């Protein structure tokens, strides 16, 4: 069905309807998008299927250009980033210097995610199929920040950062740094900061 006002009933020009509250899909629920044709005023509604996360495979996951979000966004099969409490995650284009990271551990990427605070507001979620190592690449420019892995977000916030198999510290630096976190068994895990904001460049999963 074409637009009744356009010549020869050309296709509608669909734009998000700013008068209605569209929602983004999550793992728990579908989202919904409301559209309107500004030429004739016709409306349509689109269901956005809920996120099916799956399990993460061995290999590299890098930051994805997601703009600025306050919801969940899938980075790769088995991996998403998400926000709570009206917090936001912001994608920033450009590359950090590799600094002292050996060439064999470097990889091509276009930008990074600014995880602007503690895990209670901004987190990475992973479904892993077994014991694995997460080689995590990131930084923080103005202070040291501790990042950890746990089976719940609350456990990150209450973490004992002396457990160096699960919690690593990015020192204050403009350069990307490489840190290693060990996961003991299959399950769902959250990555996030105990002490403040940090920049996520990527991670390499090894089973």
Q: Model-predicted segments: where are they?
A:
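Extracellular glycan-recognition surfaces and repeat-rich motifs
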Residues: 74-107
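Short glycine-aromatic motifs
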Residues: 12-19, 79, 96-99, 106, ...
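Extracellular modular ligand-binding repeats in secreted and cell-surface proteins
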Residues: 1-52
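Terminal, low-complexity interaction segments
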Residues: 54-87, 141-207
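Generic recognition of long tandem-repeat/solenoid scaffolds
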Residues: 1, 32-38, 109-116, 124-126, ...
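Short beta-strands within extracellular/lumenal beta-sheet-rich domains
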Residues: 103-133, 141-142, 175-180, 197-201
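Short tyrosine-centred short linear motifs in exposed loops/low-complexity segments
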Residues: 26-31, 130-132, 185-187
């Amino acid at each position: 069905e074409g637009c009744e006002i356009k010549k020869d009933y050309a296709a509608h020009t669909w734009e998000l309807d700013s008068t209605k509250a569209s929602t983004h899909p999550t793992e728990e629920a579908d989202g919904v998008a409301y559209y309107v044709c500004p030429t004739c005023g016709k409306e349509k509604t689109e269901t956005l299927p809920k996120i099916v996360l799956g399990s993460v495979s061995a290999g590299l996951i890098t930051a994805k250009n997601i703009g600025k979000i306050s919801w969940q966004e899938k980075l790769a099969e088995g991996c998403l980033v998400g926000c709570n409490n009206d917090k936001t995650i912001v994608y920033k284009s450009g590359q950090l210097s590799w600094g002292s990271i050996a060439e064999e551990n470097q990889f091509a990427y276009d930008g990074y995610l600014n995880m602007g605070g503690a895990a209670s507001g901004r987190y990475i979620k992973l479904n892993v199929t077994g014991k694995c190592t997460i080689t995590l690449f990131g930084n923080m420019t103005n202070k040291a920040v501790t990042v950890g892995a746990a089976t719940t977000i609350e456990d990150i916030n209450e973490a004992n950062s002396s457990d160096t198999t699960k919690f690593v510290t990015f020192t204050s630096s403009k350069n990307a740094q490489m840190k290693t976190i060990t996961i003991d068994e299959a399950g769902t895990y959250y990555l996030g900061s105990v002490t403040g904001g940090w920049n996520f460049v990527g991670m390499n999963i090894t089973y």
